[in-house]
Every structure is written in C-alpha cells, then in structure tokens.
UniProtKB/Swiss-Prot annotation:
Tissue expression: Red blood cells.
Binding locations of heme b: 63, 92
Modified residues (Phosphothreonine): 12
UniProt name for this protein: Hemoglobin subunit beta
Disulfide bond annotation, renumbered to this chain: none
GO BP annotation list: hydrogen peroxide catabolic process
Sites of N-acetylvaline modification: 1
C-alpha cells in the first residue's frame, strides 16, 4: 500500500491509542451482526443471535483481539503487506474458505469502530489513510485466492 510519510505518521500515531482487546471484539461483533452470513465461519463461538450476545461473547472478543494483533503486525510492514499476511491468506483461502470480500467488510468495520472510539482524533485525513491501509490488508489477505 502506498502511503505518504504524513499518512504513515497518522496511522502509526493513532494506532498507539487503539486498544486491540476492546476494538477488535467490537469490530468483529459488528461484522457478525451487520453481515450475519459471516457467522457461518464461527460455528464454535456459541450464541451469536443478537447484538448484545455478539458484543458480550468472549470468543468474539478473543478472536477480534487476535485479528487486531495481526493487523498491528501488518502496520510494521506497510511496504510488504502481501508477505506479512501470506500465511494468513493461505489459511483463510485453503483451509477456512473465507470469502475474501469479508476482509473488506471487516476493514470497514474497523475504521468505523476506530472513528467511534477515537472521536476528534480520527480526522478525515486519518480516515483516508486508514481506508488505504485496510484496503491494502484486504488485498494482501485475498492474495492466495485463485
């Protein structure tokens, strides 16, 4: 993904304010609620029947944190997202058979949740930079798909 130096500074600066254990679960919970067909990949997660069930589900929170921990690793390698996410791309493609469109949806949920939590710090310029990043991550995760 191509970011200017100013965009990289915005992305890394704001990421320091993100709490992956909170935002990850919320972003994944929103994805599962707004796009219920994505729940089929999480059969073992228990009750996903309502917004309150999703937001209080320990497995959703734990997996959301795991997702954001991986995203955080990607932020350290913005110039090599495909390499950084190659093994996750292979896993999601070959073993889990996740529709790659879901990566875009989750990225958009992450941007929305960040805007909600960061408030005024999440400026239009920050949003534009993060939209580039989540699009780049989604492309990298979809790379192994045929």
């Amino acid at each position: 993904v191509h970011l200017t130096d100013a965009e990289k500074a915005l992305v890394t600066g704001l990421w320091g304010k993100v709490k992956p254990d909170e935002l990850g679960g919320e972003a994944l919970g929103r994805l599962l609620g707004v796009y219920p067909w994505t729940q089929r990949f999480f059969d073992s997660f228990g009750d996903l029947s309502s917004a309150s069930a999703l937001m209080s589900n320990a497995k959703v929170k734990a997996h959301g944190k795991k997702v954001l921990d991986s995203f955080s690793e990607g932020l350290k390698h913005l110039d090599n997202l495909k390499g950084t996410f190659a093994s996750l791309s292979e896993l999601h493609c070959d073993k889990l058979h996740v529709d790659p469109e879901n990566f875009k949806l989750l990225g958009n949920m992450l941007v929305l949740v960040m805007a909600h939590h960061l408030g005024k710090d999440f400026t239009p310029a920050a949003q534009a930079a993060y939209q580039k990043v989540v699009a780049g991550v989604a492309t990298a995760l979809a790379h192994k798909y045929h």
